[in-house]
């Protein structure tokens, strides 16, 4: 099955300084799902970036990188002010949901326990699946953002279990997707989409070249394969 490829303008879980200049390359590669994180650039730059992505006709994502309630609340307010299409990440729906109410923003929090930066998914597969089930049952949670390849265990099995548990709500797999075999595993397990940032910027995929437009074109082709 095909999955949505979400290009994140991030490196090592931070929005890159030249993110605005990279958007035309992503659009030229046919990417129509583009996101960034709430750290790495000041708010004014994030607003300009969001406007450019929207003007290009792409769906706009913001992924939260917050380790405490206050910063997660601030991130949700940034998402609301920017008018993103999808807010991904975070672990505190009671903090975020009141802020997003009435905005039309789709919300995909992280299941499981997230620690550190860059973020790591801890716990067992069972506890992560239980967390996913609880989150997906909440009104206002539209899907999940699963840091599957930041988990020490059977990753394809975890993705499949989470996808089956929360269906029909979509699961996006994020973090450390840096090789073709991982994209194939994500799709086979039933995830609706996946994010790539650092790996594309580093030229990690076996595309025609390490140029970003070639990397993104290659990843988009892999995502669209049935």
Where are these regions (language model features)?
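Conserved N-terminal beta1-alpha1 strand-loop-helix module at the mouth
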Residues: 1-61, 66-70, 76-83, 133-137, ...
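Hydrophobic faces of well-ordered beta-strands that scaffold small-molecule active sites
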Residues: 3-10, 32-36, 60-64, 86-89, ...
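Charged helix-capping and loop-helix junction motifs
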Residues: 47, 122-130, 154-160, 209-215
């Amino acid at each position: 099955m095909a999955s949505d490829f979400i290009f994140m303008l991030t490196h090592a879980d931070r929005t890159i300084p030249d993110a605005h200049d990279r958007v035309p390359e992503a659009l030229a590669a046919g990417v129509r799902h583009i996101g960034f994180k709430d750290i790495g650039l000041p708010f004014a730059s994030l607003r300009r970036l969001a406007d450019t992505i929207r003007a290009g006709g792409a769906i706009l994502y913001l992924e939260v990188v917050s380790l405490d309630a206050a910063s997660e609340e601030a991130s949700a307010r940034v998402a609301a002010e920017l008018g993103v299409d999808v807010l991904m990440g975070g672990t505190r729906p009671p903090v975020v949901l009141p802020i997003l109410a009435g905005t039309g923003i789709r919300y995909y929090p992280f299941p499981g326990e997230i620690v550190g930066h860059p973020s790591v998914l801890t716990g067992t597969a069972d506890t992560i699946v239980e967390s996913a089930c609880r989150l997906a049952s909440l009104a206002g949670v539209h899907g999940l953002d699963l840091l599957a390849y930041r988990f020490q265990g059977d990753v394809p099995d975890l993705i499949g279990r989470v996808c089956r548990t929360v269906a029909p709500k979509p699961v996006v797999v994020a973090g450390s997707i840096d090789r073709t075999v991982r994209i194939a595993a994500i799709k086979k397990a039933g995830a609706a989409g996946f994010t790539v940032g650092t790996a594309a910027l580093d030229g990690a995929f076996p595309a025609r070249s390490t140029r970003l437009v070639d990397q993104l074109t290659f990843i988009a082709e892999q995502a669209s394969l049935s």
